[in-house]
Each structure stands twice: as C-alpha cells, then as structure tokens.
C-alpha cells in the first residue's frame, strides 16, 4: 500500500494538463526530500569554525590608605565578563604593602591550558620575587587563587616549551634553578640545579616519572631536560642541549645515577611520526634509538651495528608534555585596566 502526503481525487486528472501539473507538484515535493538528512559541507564548516571566546576585563583600584600608615595593601579587583560585572576577586588577608604601580598586574596562561590567568607581584627583594596567582577555572569561569604557583621563586612562563622556570639567588655564590611542568593538572617539578660556588658543591635533580632522583652534577648544564627511559638493563636520560641537539646519557640499572654515565652521546636528532617520537644517536658504526609511543605512553630502546639490530628492550618512559603536544591557546581574552 502506497503512502501519499496528500489525498488525491484521480477523476480530476483526465487530461494532459492535469497530468503535467501532477508531475510538477510531485517534483516540487520530491526535491526537498533529496536534501533531507544530507550534510551541507559549507554550512558545517562554518559551524565547526565558530568558536565563542569570552572577553574578560579586570578593573583594579588601589584602596590602600598610605596616610594611615598601615602595612597592608588593599585593592578592589572587579572582573567583567563581556562588559558585565562577573566576579569580585578577594585578595589574601594582611597582604604586605607594596607600591601599587610596582605590582605588575597582568595576565598569562600560567598552567598552559589555553586560558589566560591573572597574577600580580606579591614579594620583591633585590633579586628574587614571587606572584599572587589566580588560575582561570573553565568550569566556573572564575579566577581562583592558587598557592602552589605563588610559591615559585622568580618564575618565568615559557609558552613554547610549556614550562615554568624558577630562579633563586641566595647570595653572590649560591644559585638555584628549577623547571616545572603541568602534569595531569598538577604542578610538577622536573628538574632542579644547585650551584654553590662557595663550597664548590653542585647538584642536579630530575623527575623520572615517579620520583625525583639525583644525577651526576656534570650533566646539569643543559637547555632542557626532555625525558627518562627505563629498561630492564638501562636508565637513560635525554636532554636538549643549547645547540639544539639532543644528548643521550646511559647507566646500567645496577649503578647510581650520581656516578658518571656509562655512555654519553651528543648530536642526537628527533624524528616524529603520527604515533611515535624517536631520538636517534650515533657512535661510529653503532646507533642508538629511544622510541616513545604516543598511544601507549611506553617505548623501546633499539641498538644497531650498521644495519643489524643488536638489542631491543621495552622501556617505561617519562617525557615532556610539549614533546608530544604543542601549545594551543587563545581560548579567551583578558584585559587589565588600572
């Protein structure tokens, strides 16, 4: 039994005109049905590309009463979302006095999630300084104070590598430097260097994916610690040198990382495919390759003599997030108004 959109009296269609009109009506009814359920690619592309970016304006007013000789600073910090009052930021209680014009109020994507955060100077000495930090929460769309980031000494936020560099100068002969990343939404220190020229002692500490470990201090002069490969026989550290090449340092698992490495290779190169990252090194007729699998987060060590494979071992791997996924930000806009 056929189905019709309309009930039709066939007696009215006994001549060609009616049959012609019938065909025209059916054609007009049928054309829209052809497009029903089909994807209009041009319209879909527009929808996919359309991204709503909120604009936040933060208005800051100094309410400190200098004449009262109070030792605290007091500010009014109002957040406007798309030109409407949205949040009143509360500053820490008993915030030590610091000149308003030297607070360096600003915004930056501190935790590299694509959203700008809000910060200003908390403490400043002759060399070292720290920030009061408010991270943007994309769920509540509010700026929330975070003491972990505020505890970092003299931070520098490096978007290119998605790292936070920290510097602390104790005196003219004592220096500390640290590097932090955001790992599983948690601030994580991945390296620390201590240079004490007065006592002639030096330390180099790295994060191996589970814990911090002390490493031979001669390896501390690097641009960036990249990753740690652990096989059943070897512990391997991959570093990025100042010349843009990679360094391979390897120890037998039975040896302490504070000892000199069994093998150091420089001038390494990085190669990347859709699912893998490889760090390749050569020494004469031997080549060493550390492979990280993006899908499993594990890897392999492969050793070749000329083209012959001598060794292949599975490895647990810690690797810098930026090596796997580069920064993509600019999800909203923050304007500071004083």
Language-model regions: role of each:
Residues 111-122, 164:
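Acidic/hydrophobic-patterned starts of short beta strands in beta-sheet-rich repeat architectures
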Residues 74-99, 139-156, 164, 191:
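Blade-edge motifs of beta-propeller repeat domains
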Residues 80-82, 128-145, 179-184:
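Beta-propeller blade repeat segments, especially FG-GAP/WD-type strand-to-loop junctions
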Residues 136, 226-282:
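Central antiparallel beta-sheet cores of small beta-barrel/beta-sandwich binding domains
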Residues 47-49, 100-110, 152-165:
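Beta-propeller blade termini
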Residues 126-132, 174-178, 246-248, 298:
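Structural motif
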Residues 24-33:
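Sec-dependent N-terminal signal peptides
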Residues 37-74, 161-230, 275-278, 283-286, ...:
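Acidic, small-residue rich beta-repeat scaffolds with periodic aromatic anchors
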């Amino acid at each position: 039994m056929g189905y019709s959109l309309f009930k039709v009296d066939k007696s009215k269609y006994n001549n060609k005109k009616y049959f012609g009109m019938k065909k025209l009506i059916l054609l007009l009814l049928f054309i829209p049905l052809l497009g029903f359920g089909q994807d209009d690619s041009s319209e879909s592309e527009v929808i996919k590309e359309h991204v709503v970016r909120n604009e936040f304006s933060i208005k800051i007013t100094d309410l400190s009463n200098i004449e009262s000789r109070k030792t605290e600073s007091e500010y009014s910090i109002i957040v406007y979302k798309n030109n409407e009052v949205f949040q009143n930021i509360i500053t820490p209680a008993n915030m030590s006095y610091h000149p308003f014009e030297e607070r360096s109020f600003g915004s930056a994507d501190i935790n590299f999630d694509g959203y700008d955060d809000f910060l200003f100077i908390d403490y400043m000495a002759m060399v070292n300084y720290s920030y009061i930090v408010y991270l943007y929460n994309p769920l509540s769309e509010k700026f929330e104070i975070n003491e972990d980031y505020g505890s970092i000494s003299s931070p520098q936020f490096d978007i290119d590598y998605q790292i936070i560099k920290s510097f602390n100068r104790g005196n003219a002969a004592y220096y500390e430097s640290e590097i932090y990343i955001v790992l599983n939404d948690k601030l994580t220190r991945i390296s620390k260097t201590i240079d004490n020229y007065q006592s002639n002692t030096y330390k180099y500490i790295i994060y191996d994916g589970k814990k911090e470990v002390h490493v031979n201090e001669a390896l501390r002069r690097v641009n960036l610690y990249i990753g740690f490969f652990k096989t059943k026989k070897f512990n391997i550290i991959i570093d990025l040198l100042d010349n843009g090449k990679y360094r391979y340092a390897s120890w037998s698992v039975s040896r302490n990382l504070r000892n000199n490495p069994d093998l150091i290779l420089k001038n390494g190169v990085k190669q990347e495919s859709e699912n893998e990252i490889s760090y390749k090194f050569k020494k004469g007729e031997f080549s060493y390759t550390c492979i990280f699998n993006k899908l499993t987060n594990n890897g392999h060590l492969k050793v070749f003599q000329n083209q012959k494979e001598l060794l292949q071992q599975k490895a647990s791997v810690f690797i810098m997030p930026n090596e796997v996924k580069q920064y993509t930000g600019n999800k909203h806009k923050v304007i500071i108004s004083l």
